[in-house]
Amino acid sequence: ASGQLHRPQPQEHTSTSAAAGTWRHTQASESRHRLPHCSAAPSHQDHSAMGFGPELWCPKGHSELLRLQDSELRLLELMKKWMSERAKSDREYAGMLHHMFSQLGSEEPPPALPLQEDRQSVCSTDQERSGVTALETIKNHISGIFSPRFSLPPPVPLIPEVQKPLCQQAWYHGAIPRSEVQELLKCSGDFLVRESQGKQEYVLSVLWDGQPRHFIIQAADNLYRLEGDGFPTIPLLIDHLLQSQQPITRKSGIVLTRAVLKDKWVLNHEDVLLGERIGRGNFGEVFSGRLRADNTPVAVKSCRETLPPELKAKFLQEARILKQYNHPNIVRLIGVCTQKQPIYIVMELVQGGDFLSFLRSKGPHLKMKELIKMMENAAAGMEYLESKHCIHRDLAARNCLVTEKNTLKISDFGMSRQEEDGVYASTGGMKQIPVKWTAPEALNYGRYSSESDVWSFGILLWEAFSLGAVPYANLSNQQTREAIEQGVRLEPPEQCPEDVYRLMQRCWEYDPRRRPSFGAVHQDLIAIRKRHR
Protein backbone atom coordinates (compact mmCIF):
# COMPACT_ATOMS: atom_id res chain seq x y z
CA ALA A 1 0.00 0.00 0.00
CA SER A 2 1.20 3.52 -0.72
CA GLY A 3 0.05 7.02 0.00
CA GLN A 4 1.69 9.82 2.06
CA LEU A 5 0.41 10.34 5.62
CA HIS A 6 1.21 13.34 7.85
CA ARG A 7 2.27 13.59 11.49
CA PRO A 8 -0.10 15.27 13.97
CA GLN A 9 0.44 19.03 14.28
CA PRO A 10 -0.26 20.91 17.55
CA GLN A 11 -2.73 23.78 17.44
CA GLU A 12 -0.95 27.12 17.04
CA HIS A 13 -1.51 30.11 19.36
CA THR A 14 -0.91 33.73 18.56
CA SER A 15 0.85 34.46 21.88
CA THR A 16 4.62 33.98 21.87
CA SER A 17 5.31 35.11 25.49
CA ALA A 18 7.15 32.97 27.99
CA ALA A 19 4.02 32.97 30.14
CA ALA A 20 2.00 31.50 27.31
CA GLY A 21 4.66 28.84 26.82
CA THR A 22 4.59 28.10 30.56
CA TRP A 23 0.77 27.90 30.42
CA ARG A 24 0.92 25.41 27.56
CA HIS A 25 3.43 23.26 29.46
CA THR A 26 1.30 23.39 32.61
CA GLN A 27 -1.87 22.57 30.72
CA ALA A 28 -0.17 19.67 28.97
CA SER A 29 1.16 18.43 32.32
CA GLU A 30 -2.23 18.73 34.00
CA SER A 31 -3.95 17.12 31.08
CA ARG A 32 -1.47 14.26 31.24
CA HIS A 33 -2.12 13.72 34.96
CA ARG A 34 -5.89 13.85 34.40
CA LEU A 35 -5.75 10.90 31.94
CA PRO A 36 -6.95 7.79 33.77
CA HIS A 37 -4.53 4.92 34.40
CA CYS A 38 -1.55 6.89 33.02
CA SER A 39 1.66 6.50 34.99
CA ALA A 40 4.37 9.07 35.36
CA ALA A 41 6.67 9.67 32.43
CA PRO A 42 9.81 7.53 32.30
CA SER A 43 13.29 8.96 32.06
CA HIS A 44 14.26 11.09 29.06
CA GLN A 45 16.39 8.24 27.71
CA ASP A 46 13.49 5.80 27.91
CA HIS A 47 10.85 7.88 26.19
CA SER A 48 13.32 9.14 23.58
CA ALA A 49 14.03 5.56 22.67
CA MET A 50 10.31 5.09 22.24
CA GLY A 51 10.24 7.94 19.74
CA PHE A 52 8.19 10.34 21.92
CA GLY A 53 9.01 13.58 23.70
CA PRO A 54 8.26 13.79 27.46
CA GLU A 55 5.23 16.01 26.91
CA LEU A 56 3.48 13.34 24.76
CA TRP A 57 4.24 10.18 26.74
CA CYS A 58 1.18 8.16 27.65
CA PRO A 59 1.48 4.35 27.65
CA LYS A 60 -2.22 3.75 27.06
CA GLY A 61 -2.40 6.33 24.27
CA HIS A 62 0.67 4.84 22.64
CA SER A 63 -0.78 1.34 22.94
CA GLU A 64 -4.09 2.49 21.48
CA LEU A 65 -2.28 4.12 18.57
CA LEU A 66 -0.34 0.93 17.81
CA ARG A 67 -3.54 -1.10 18.09
CA LEU A 68 -5.27 1.15 15.55
CA GLN A 69 -2.36 0.84 13.15
CA ASP A 70 -2.36 -2.95 13.48
CA SER A 71 -6.09 -2.94 12.75
CA GLU A 72 -5.51 -0.81 9.67
CA LEU A 73 -2.84 -3.18 8.39
CA ARG A 74 -5.04 -6.22 8.92
CA LEU A 75 -7.93 -4.47 7.20
CA LEU A 76 -5.72 -3.56 4.24
CA GLU A 77 -4.46 -7.12 3.86
CA LEU A 78 -7.99 -8.47 4.12
CA MET A 79 -9.26 -6.01 1.50
CA LYS A 80 -6.40 -6.82 -0.88
CA LYS A 81 -7.00 -10.55 -0.59
CA TRP A 82 -10.76 -10.22 -0.85
CA MET A 83 -10.71 -7.86 -3.81
CA SER A 84 -8.10 -9.87 -5.71
CA GLU A 85 -10.35 -12.92 -5.42
CA ARG A 86 -13.69 -11.25 -5.99
CA ALA A 87 -13.25 -8.25 -8.25
CA LYS A 88 -14.43 -8.98 -11.78
CA SER A 89 -14.73 -5.47 -13.15
CA ASP A 90 -13.99 -1.85 -12.28
CA ARG A 91 -17.63 -1.34 -11.34
CA GLU A 92 -17.65 -4.29 -8.94
CA TYR A 93 -14.27 -3.17 -7.59
CA ALA A 94 -15.64 0.29 -6.79
CA GLY A 95 -18.76 -1.21 -5.23
CA MET A 96 -16.72 -3.35 -2.87
CA LEU A 97 -14.60 -0.38 -1.82
CA HIS A 98 -17.71 1.65 -1.08
CA HIS A 99 -19.07 -1.22 1.00
CA MET A 100 -15.85 -1.53 3.02
CA PHE A 101 -15.61 2.22 3.68
CA SER A 102 -19.25 2.34 4.76
CA GLN A 103 -18.52 -0.32 7.37
CA LEU A 104 -15.96 1.97 8.99
CA GLY A 105 -18.81 4.20 10.14
CA SER A 106 -19.03 7.97 10.21
CA GLU A 107 -17.12 8.45 13.48
CA GLU A 108 -13.51 9.36 12.82
CA PRO A 109 -10.83 7.55 14.86
CA PRO A 110 -7.80 9.32 16.39
CA PRO A 111 -4.99 10.47 14.08
CA ALA A 112 -2.58 7.77 12.93
CA LEU A 113 1.08 7.78 11.99
CA PRO A 114 2.20 7.08 8.42
CA LEU A 115 3.26 3.46 8.12
CA GLN A 116 6.65 4.30 6.69
CA GLU A 117 7.37 6.65 9.60
CA ASP A 118 6.34 4.47 12.54
CA ARG A 119 9.81 4.65 14.06
CA GLN A 120 10.37 8.38 13.57
CA SER A 121 10.06 10.90 16.38
CA VAL A 122 7.02 13.16 16.47
CA CYS A 123 8.40 15.62 18.98
CA SER A 124 10.20 17.86 16.50
CA THR A 125 7.96 20.90 16.12
CA ASP A 126 9.64 22.12 12.91
CA GLN A 127 8.59 18.87 11.10
CA GLU A 128 5.10 18.52 12.55
CA ARG A 129 2.32 18.50 10.00
CA SER A 130 -1.45 18.40 10.05
CA GLY A 131 -2.99 15.02 10.97
CA VAL A 132 -5.19 12.88 8.86
CA THR A 133 -7.95 10.61 9.95
CA ALA A 134 -7.68 6.84 9.90
CA LEU A 135 -10.23 6.77 7.10
CA GLU A 136 -8.04 9.05 4.99
CA THR A 137 -5.03 6.94 5.95
CA ILE A 138 -6.69 3.81 4.62
CA LYS A 139 -7.72 5.59 1.44
CA ASN A 140 -4.15 6.78 0.87
CA HIS A 141 -2.73 3.32 1.44
CA ILE A 142 -5.30 1.74 -0.85
CA SER A 143 -4.32 4.15 -3.62
CA GLY A 144 -1.29 1.93 -4.18
CA ILE A 145 -3.61 -0.87 -5.20
CA PHE A 146 -4.90 1.25 -8.08
CA SER A 147 -1.54 2.32 -9.47
CA PRO A 148 -1.44 2.24 -13.30
CA ARG A 149 -0.88 -1.29 -14.63
CA PHE A 150 1.08 -0.21 -17.69
CA SER A 151 3.38 2.69 -18.40
CA LEU A 152 2.84 4.26 -21.82
CA PRO A 153 5.54 5.62 -24.12
CA PRO A 154 5.40 9.30 -24.97
CA PRO A 155 2.92 10.16 -27.74
CA VAL A 156 4.33 10.24 -31.26
CA PRO A 157 3.58 13.02 -33.72
CA LEU A 158 0.54 12.24 -35.87
CA ILE A 159 1.13 12.14 -39.62
CA PRO A 160 -1.68 13.66 -41.71
CA GLU A 161 -3.40 11.07 -43.89
CA VAL A 162 -2.50 12.88 -47.09
CA GLN A 163 1.21 12.60 -46.22
CA LYS A 164 1.13 8.83 -45.70
CA PRO A 165 2.46 6.62 -48.53
CA LEU A 166 0.08 5.15 -51.08
CA CYS A 167 0.16 1.63 -49.60
CA GLN A 168 -1.18 3.02 -46.28
CA GLN A 169 -4.13 4.81 -47.85
CA ALA A 170 -7.44 3.16 -46.97
CA TRP A 171 -8.77 3.74 -50.51
CA TYR A 172 -5.80 1.98 -52.17
CA HIS A 173 -6.83 -1.60 -52.91
CA GLY A 174 -3.69 -2.88 -54.58
CA ALA A 175 -3.80 -5.48 -57.34
CA ILE A 176 -7.47 -6.46 -57.09
CA PRO A 177 -9.19 -7.77 -60.24
CA ARG A 178 -11.19 -5.35 -62.37
CA SER A 179 -14.28 -7.53 -61.90
CA GLU A 180 -14.11 -7.06 -58.12
CA VAL A 181 -13.98 -3.28 -58.54
CA GLN A 182 -17.47 -3.36 -60.04
CA GLU A 183 -18.78 -5.05 -56.88
CA LEU A 184 -17.17 -2.47 -54.57
CA LEU A 185 -18.40 0.70 -56.30
CA LYS A 186 -22.05 1.21 -55.30
CA CYS A 187 -22.99 4.89 -55.77
CA SER A 188 -22.16 7.57 -58.30
CA GLY A 189 -18.87 9.22 -57.34
CA ASP A 190 -17.56 6.21 -55.38
CA PHE A 191 -13.87 5.68 -56.14
CA LEU A 192 -10.77 3.68 -55.32
CA VAL A 193 -7.20 3.41 -56.59
CA ARG A 194 -5.75 0.06 -57.65
CA GLU A 195 -2.78 -1.42 -59.46
CA SER A 196 -3.43 -2.56 -63.00
CA GLN A 197 -2.71 -6.27 -63.19
CA GLY A 198 0.29 -7.05 -65.35
CA LYS A 199 0.97 -3.45 -66.41
CA GLN A 200 2.45 -1.97 -63.21
CA GLU A 201 0.24 1.12 -63.60
CA TYR A 202 -2.01 2.83 -61.08
CA VAL A 203 -5.66 3.23 -62.01
CA LEU A 204 -8.36 5.48 -60.53
CA SER A 205 -11.69 3.63 -60.76
CA VAL A 206 -14.92 5.64 -60.33
CA LEU A 207 -18.61 4.80 -60.66
CA TRP A 208 -20.44 7.37 -62.79
CA ASP A 209 -23.90 7.14 -64.35
CA GLY A 210 -24.13 3.53 -63.24
CA GLN A 211 -20.94 2.49 -65.05
CA PRO A 212 -17.43 1.95 -63.64
CA ARG A 213 -14.90 4.25 -65.32
CA HIS A 214 -11.15 3.64 -65.17
CA PHE A 215 -8.46 6.34 -65.52
CA ILE A 216 -4.75 5.54 -65.74
CA ILE A 217 -2.76 7.88 -63.49
CA GLN A 218 0.08 9.34 -65.58
CA ALA A 219 3.56 9.40 -64.03
CA ALA A 220 6.21 11.71 -65.52
CA ASP A 221 9.02 13.88 -64.12
CA ASN A 222 8.34 12.52 -60.60
CA LEU A 223 4.81 13.91 -60.73
CA TYR A 224 1.40 12.22 -60.92
CA ARG A 225 -1.48 13.70 -62.89
CA LEU A 226 -4.73 12.86 -64.66
CA GLU A 227 -5.30 16.16 -66.43
CA GLY A 228 -3.81 19.49 -65.49
CA ASP A 229 -1.46 20.00 -62.55
CA GLY A 230 0.88 17.26 -61.36
CA PHE A 231 1.51 16.30 -57.73
CA PRO A 232 4.50 14.65 -56.01
CA THR A 233 2.37 11.75 -54.73
CA ILE A 234 -0.88 10.03 -55.66
CA PRO A 235 -2.44 10.77 -52.21
CA LEU A 236 -1.87 14.51 -52.82
CA LEU A 237 -3.48 14.21 -56.26
CA ILE A 238 -6.55 12.42 -54.88
CA ASP A 239 -6.82 14.87 -51.98
CA HIS A 240 -6.77 17.79 -54.43
CA LEU A 241 -9.56 16.26 -56.54
CA LEU A 242 -11.68 15.59 -53.44
CA GLN A 243 -11.21 19.00 -51.82
CA SER A 244 -11.56 21.11 -54.97
CA GLN A 245 -14.35 18.98 -56.51
CA GLN A 246 -12.59 19.54 -59.81
CA PRO A 247 -13.62 17.07 -62.55
CA ILE A 248 -11.11 14.29 -63.22
CA THR A 249 -11.09 15.37 -66.85
CA ARG A 250 -13.01 18.19 -68.53
CA LYS A 251 -14.48 15.78 -71.06
CA SER A 252 -15.81 13.27 -68.51
CA GLY A 253 -17.07 15.77 -65.94
CA ILE A 254 -16.66 13.06 -63.27
CA VAL A 255 -16.26 14.29 -59.69
CA LEU A 256 -14.97 12.20 -56.79
CA THR A 257 -17.49 11.91 -53.96
CA ARG A 258 -16.75 9.01 -51.60
CA ALA A 259 -13.69 6.82 -51.14
CA VAL A 260 -14.37 3.08 -50.98
CA LEU A 261 -12.15 1.75 -48.21
CA LYS A 262 -10.47 -1.64 -48.23
CA ASP A 263 -11.83 -4.04 -45.65
CA LYS A 264 -10.18 -5.43 -42.52
CA TRP A 265 -8.95 -8.52 -44.38
CA VAL A 266 -6.42 -6.62 -46.48
CA LEU A 267 -2.84 -7.05 -45.25
CA ASN A 268 0.42 -5.61 -46.48
CA HIS A 269 2.97 -8.05 -47.90
CA GLU A 270 5.38 -6.79 -45.24
CA ASP A 271 2.99 -8.06 -42.54
CA VAL A 272 3.79 -11.67 -43.48
CA LEU A 273 7.08 -13.55 -43.10
CA LEU A 274 7.30 -16.44 -45.58
CA GLY A 275 8.78 -19.78 -44.53
CA GLU A 276 9.31 -22.99 -46.46
CA ARG A 277 7.19 -24.26 -49.32
CA ILE A 278 4.66 -26.81 -48.05
CA GLY A 279 2.65 -27.48 -51.19
CA ARG A 280 1.50 -26.47 -54.63
CA GLY A 281 -1.98 -25.50 -55.77
CA ASN A 282 -3.76 -24.77 -59.04
CA PHE A 283 -2.72 -21.11 -58.95
CA GLY A 284 0.71 -21.21 -57.34
CA GLU A 285 2.75 -22.41 -54.39
CA VAL A 286 1.77 -22.67 -50.73
CA PHE A 287 4.17 -21.57 -47.98
CA SER A 288 4.27 -21.72 -44.22
CA GLY A 289 4.76 -18.35 -42.57
CA ARG A 290 4.20 -16.06 -39.61
CA LEU A 291 2.49 -12.74 -39.03
CA ARG A 292 5.00 -10.10 -37.96
CA ALA A 293 2.56 -8.56 -35.49
CA ASP A 294 2.15 -11.54 -33.14
CA ASN A 295 4.07 -14.48 -34.68
CA THR A 296 0.83 -16.31 -35.53
CA PRO A 297 1.64 -19.36 -37.72
CA VAL A 298 -0.08 -19.05 -41.11
CA ALA A 299 -0.36 -20.80 -44.46
CA VAL A 300 0.23 -18.50 -47.43
CA LYS A 301 -1.21 -19.33 -50.84
CA SER A 302 0.49 -17.40 -53.63
CA CYS A 303 -0.83 -16.62 -57.10
CA ARG A 304 1.56 -16.79 -60.03
CA GLU A 305 2.13 -13.36 -61.54
CA THR A 306 1.96 -14.77 -65.08
CA LEU A 307 -1.65 -15.92 -64.76
CA PRO A 308 -4.25 -13.98 -66.79
CA PRO A 309 -6.55 -11.59 -64.87
CA GLU A 310 -9.56 -13.95 -65.02
CA LEU A 311 -7.60 -16.69 -63.21
CA LYS A 312 -6.35 -14.22 -60.60
CA ALA A 313 -9.98 -13.31 -59.97
CA LYS A 314 -10.77 -17.01 -59.46
CA PHE A 315 -7.83 -17.26 -57.05
CA LEU A 316 -9.33 -14.53 -54.85
CA GLN A 317 -12.76 -16.18 -54.98
CA GLU A 318 -11.72 -18.46 -52.12
CA ALA A 319 -10.95 -15.48 -49.87
CA ARG A 320 -14.25 -13.78 -50.73
CA ILE A 321 -16.07 -16.95 -49.67
CA LEU A 322 -14.08 -17.63 -46.50
CA LYS A 323 -14.16 -14.13 -45.02
CA GLN A 324 -17.88 -14.57 -44.35
CA TYR A 325 -17.47 -17.74 -42.28
CA ASN A 326 -16.48 -18.58 -38.72
CA HIS A 327 -16.72 -22.22 -37.63
CA PRO A 328 -14.32 -24.59 -35.81
CA ASN A 329 -14.52 -27.11 -38.67
CA ILE A 330 -13.90 -24.56 -41.46
CA VAL A 331 -10.35 -23.38 -42.10
CA ARG A 332 -10.07 -19.72 -41.05
CA LEU A 333 -9.12 -16.85 -43.35
CA ILE A 334 -6.67 -14.35 -41.84
CA GLY A 335 -6.34 -11.94 -44.74
CA VAL A 336 -5.30 -11.21 -48.31
CA CYS A 337 -2.28 -9.34 -49.62
CA THR A 338 -3.30 -7.51 -52.78
CA GLN A 339 -1.18 -4.37 -52.48
CA LYS A 340 1.30 -5.69 -55.05
CA GLN A 341 2.25 -8.83 -56.97
CA PRO A 342 2.25 -11.71 -56.20
CA ILE A 343 -1.16 -11.83 -54.51
CA TYR A 344 -1.36 -13.84 -51.27
CA ILE A 345 -4.22 -15.50 -49.44
CA VAL A 346 -3.25 -15.88 -45.76
CA MET A 347 -5.00 -18.61 -43.77
CA GLU A 348 -4.58 -20.38 -40.46
CA LEU A 349 -1.85 -23.01 -40.55
CA VAL A 350 -3.35 -26.42 -39.73
CA GLN A 351 -0.32 -28.34 -38.54
CA GLY A 352 -1.52 -31.90 -39.17
CA GLY A 353 -1.59 -31.54 -42.95
CA ASP A 354 -4.17 -32.84 -45.43
CA PHE A 355 -6.60 -35.59 -44.47
CA LEU A 356 -5.64 -37.93 -47.34
CA SER A 357 -1.98 -38.08 -46.27
CA PHE A 358 -3.09 -38.42 -42.65
CA LEU A 359 -5.29 -41.43 -43.51
CA ARG A 360 -2.52 -43.20 -45.40
CA SER A 361 0.13 -42.65 -42.72
CA LYS A 362 -1.77 -42.69 -39.42
CA GLY A 363 -5.11 -44.23 -40.35
CA PRO A 364 -4.14 -47.82 -39.43
CA HIS A 365 -3.44 -46.69 -35.85
CA LEU A 366 -6.78 -44.90 -35.37
CA LYS A 367 -9.60 -46.38 -33.34
CA MET A 368 -12.95 -46.72 -35.10
CA LYS A 369 -14.54 -44.17 -32.76
CA GLU A 370 -11.79 -41.62 -33.56
CA LEU A 371 -12.36 -42.02 -37.29
CA ILE A 372 -16.12 -41.60 -36.88
CA LYS A 373 -15.49 -38.47 -34.78
CA MET A 374 -13.38 -36.93 -37.55
CA MET A 375 -16.16 -37.54 -40.07
CA GLU A 376 -18.56 -36.00 -37.58
CA ASN A 377 -16.32 -32.89 -37.69
CA ALA A 378 -16.56 -32.85 -41.49
CA ALA A 379 -20.35 -33.16 -41.37
CA ALA A 380 -20.56 -30.28 -38.85
CA GLY A 381 -18.52 -28.04 -41.14
CA MET A 382 -20.62 -28.94 -44.17
CA GLU A 383 -23.84 -28.40 -42.21
CA TYR A 384 -22.60 -24.87 -41.47
CA LEU A 385 -21.83 -24.24 -45.16
CA GLU A 386 -25.26 -25.60 -46.10
CA SER A 387 -26.86 -23.04 -43.75
CA LYS A 388 -24.91 -20.30 -45.56
CA HIS A 389 -26.04 -21.52 -49.02
CA CYS A 390 -22.42 -22.30 -49.86
CA ILE A 391 -21.70 -25.10 -52.36
CA HIS A 392 -18.18 -26.48 -51.94
CA ARG A 393 -18.04 -28.46 -55.24
CA ASP A 394 -14.70 -30.11 -54.42
CA LEU A 395 -15.23 -32.00 -51.17
CA ALA A 396 -12.61 -34.75 -50.85
CA ALA A 397 -10.03 -36.03 -48.35
CA ARG A 398 -7.27 -34.07 -50.13
CA ASN A 399 -9.18 -30.85 -49.44
CA CYS A 400 -9.65 -31.40 -45.71
CA LEU A 401 -7.05 -30.55 -43.07
CA VAL A 402 -6.28 -32.17 -39.71
CA THR A 403 -5.14 -30.34 -36.58
CA GLU A 404 -2.61 -31.69 -34.10
CA LYS A 405 -5.55 -32.85 -31.97
CA ASN A 406 -7.10 -34.76 -34.89
CA THR A 407 -9.88 -32.22 -35.48
CA LEU A 408 -10.91 -32.11 -39.13
CA LYS A 409 -11.45 -28.81 -40.99
CA ILE A 410 -12.97 -28.26 -44.43
CA SER A 411 -10.54 -26.41 -46.71
CA ASP A 412 -9.81 -25.47 -50.34
CA PHE A 413 -12.73 -23.27 -51.39
CA GLY A 414 -11.26 -22.47 -54.80
CA MET A 415 -14.25 -24.02 -56.62
CA SER A 416 -16.84 -22.95 -54.05
CA ARG A 417 -19.84 -20.80 -54.86
CA GLN A 418 -22.39 -19.05 -52.68
CA GLU A 419 -25.84 -18.93 -54.28
CA GLU A 420 -29.08 -17.48 -52.88
CA ASP A 421 -31.14 -20.49 -53.99
CA GLY A 422 -28.40 -22.99 -53.14
CA VAL A 423 -27.96 -24.04 -56.78
CA TYR A 424 -25.03 -23.21 -59.07
CA ALA A 425 -25.11 -23.87 -62.81
CA SER A 426 -21.64 -24.39 -64.27
CA THR A 427 -20.89 -23.59 -67.91
CA GLY A 428 -17.12 -24.04 -67.74
CA GLY A 429 -16.89 -27.57 -69.13
CA MET A 430 -15.30 -30.65 -67.55
CA LYS A 431 -11.67 -29.56 -67.48
CA GLN A 432 -11.19 -29.24 -63.70
CA ILE A 433 -14.09 -31.31 -62.38
CA PRO A 434 -13.09 -34.18 -60.02
CA VAL A 435 -15.31 -36.73 -61.78
CA LYS A 436 -15.06 -39.56 -59.25
CA TRP A 437 -16.24 -37.27 -56.41
CA THR A 438 -18.95 -35.41 -58.36
CA ALA A 439 -22.69 -36.11 -58.35
CA PRO A 440 -24.28 -37.29 -61.64
CA GLU A 441 -26.55 -34.23 -62.03
CA ALA A 442 -23.48 -31.98 -61.79
CA LEU A 443 -21.62 -34.06 -64.37
CA ASN A 444 -24.58 -34.27 -66.74
CA TYR A 445 -26.17 -30.83 -66.39
CA GLY A 446 -23.67 -28.67 -64.48
CA ARG A 447 -26.16 -28.37 -61.62
CA TYR A 448 -24.41 -27.99 -58.25
CA SER A 449 -26.18 -27.82 -54.89
CA SER A 450 -25.82 -28.92 -51.26
CA GLU A 451 -27.28 -32.23 -52.44
CA SER A 452 -24.39 -32.68 -54.87
CA ASP A 453 -22.01 -31.92 -51.97
CA VAL A 454 -23.76 -34.70 -50.00
CA TRP A 455 -22.85 -37.14 -52.82
CA SER A 456 -19.21 -36.01 -52.51
CA PHE A 457 -19.43 -36.44 -48.73
CA GLY A 458 -20.36 -40.09 -49.33
CA ILE A 459 -17.14 -40.51 -51.34
CA LEU A 460 -15.24 -38.75 -48.51
CA LEU A 461 -16.72 -41.26 -46.04
CA TRP A 462 -15.53 -44.10 -48.28
CA GLU A 463 -12.02 -42.56 -48.45
CA ALA A 464 -11.90 -42.28 -44.67
CA PHE A 465 -12.92 -45.87 -43.92
CA SER A 466 -10.72 -47.28 -46.70
CA LEU A 467 -7.82 -45.33 -45.12
CA GLY A 468 -7.08 -43.23 -48.19
CA ALA A 469 -7.76 -45.60 -51.07
CA VAL A 470 -8.61 -44.22 -54.53
CA PRO A 471 -12.32 -44.54 -55.41
CA TYR A 472 -13.08 -46.50 -58.61
CA ALA A 473 -9.35 -47.20 -58.84
CA ASN A 474 -9.68 -49.55 -61.82
CA LEU A 475 -11.97 -47.27 -63.85
CA SER A 476 -11.27 -44.20 -65.96
CA ASN A 477 -13.34 -41.06 -65.49
CA GLN A 478 -15.59 -41.97 -68.43
CA GLN A 479 -16.02 -45.56 -67.22
CA THR A 480 -16.88 -44.23 -63.76
CA ARG A 481 -19.64 -42.02 -65.19
CA GLU A 482 -21.11 -44.91 -67.16
CA ALA A 483 -21.00 -47.24 -64.14
CA ILE A 484 -22.80 -44.71 -61.94
CA GLU A 485 -25.52 -44.24 -64.56
CA GLN A 486 -26.01 -48.03 -64.52
CA GLY A 487 -26.45 -48.01 -60.73
CA VAL A 488 -22.99 -49.27 -59.77
CA ARG A 489 -21.74 -47.99 -56.39
CA LEU A 490 -18.51 -48.45 -54.43
CA GLU A 491 -18.23 -51.57 -52.30
CA PRO A 492 -17.94 -51.13 -48.51
CA PRO A 493 -14.33 -50.76 -47.32
CA GLU A 494 -12.86 -53.57 -45.25
CA GLN A 495 -13.88 -53.32 -41.56
CA CYS A 496 -16.32 -50.48 -42.34
CA PRO A 497 -19.29 -50.55 -39.91
CA GLU A 498 -22.57 -51.47 -41.56
CA ASP A 499 -24.37 -48.35 -40.33
CA VAL A 500 -21.63 -46.17 -41.84
CA TYR A 501 -21.94 -47.93 -45.22
CA ARG A 502 -25.73 -47.50 -45.14
CA LEU A 503 -25.15 -43.77 -44.67
CA MET A 504 -22.81 -43.77 -47.70
CA GLN A 505 -25.50 -45.44 -49.81
CA ARG A 506 -28.05 -42.80 -48.79
CA CYS A 507 -25.59 -40.10 -49.90
CA TRP A 508 -25.31 -41.84 -53.30
CA GLU A 509 -29.01 -41.79 -54.17
CA TYR A 510 -29.28 -40.93 -57.87
CA ASP A 511 -32.18 -38.54 -57.22
CA PRO A 512 -30.76 -35.54 -55.29
CA ARG A 513 -34.07 -35.06 -53.47
CA ARG A 514 -33.71 -38.45 -51.78
CA ARG A 515 -30.29 -37.67 -50.28
CA PRO A 516 -30.12 -36.59 -46.61
CA SER A 517 -29.27 -33.02 -45.65
CA PHE A 518 -25.96 -32.35 -43.93
CA GLY A 519 -27.86 -31.71 -40.72
CA ALA A 520 -29.27 -35.25 -40.91
CA VAL A 521 -25.85 -36.69 -41.83
CA HIS A 522 -24.30 -34.95 -38.83
CA GLN A 523 -26.91 -36.34 -36.43
CA ASP A 524 -26.54 -39.84 -37.91
CA LEU A 525 -22.79 -39.79 -37.33
CA ILE A 526 -23.25 -38.65 -33.73
CA ALA A 527 -25.61 -41.58 -33.14
CA ILE A 528 -23.23 -44.02 -34.87
CA ARG A 529 -20.29 -42.85 -32.73
CA LYS A 530 -22.28 -43.38 -29.53
CA ARG A 531 -23.04 -46.94 -30.60
CA HIS A 532 -19.34 -47.69 -31.14
CA ARG A 533 -18.05 -47.02 -27.63
Curated annotation (Swiss-Prot):
Belongs to the protein kinase superfamily. Tyr protein kinase family. Fes/fps subfamily. This is Tyrosine-protein kinase transforming protein Fps. The F-BAR domain is truncated and contains only the FCH region (the coiled-coil region is missing). The gene is V-FPS. The modification Phosphotyrosine is found at residue 424. The lineage of its organism: Viruses, Riboviria, Pararnavirae, Artverviricota, Revtraviricetes. Pfam families: PK_Tyr_Ser-Thr, SH2. It comes from Avian sarcoma virus (strain PRCII). ATP binds at residues 278-286, 301. Residues 11-29 have a biased composition (Polar residues). Residues 272-525 form the Protein kinase domain. Keywords: ATP-binding, Kinase, Nucleotide-binding, Oncogene, Phosphoprotein, SH2 domain, Transferase, Tyrosine-protein kinase. The keyword Protein transport does not apply. The keyword Kinase applies. One of its GO terms (molecular function) is ATP binding. Residues 50-124 form the F-BAR domain. This protein is synthesized as a Gag-Fps polyprotein. It catalyses: L-tyrosyl-[protein] + ATP = O-phospho-L-tyrosyl-[protein] + ADP + H(+). Its EC number is 2.7.10.2. Residues 1-46 are annotated as: Disordered. The active site is at residue 394. Coiled coil: none annotated.
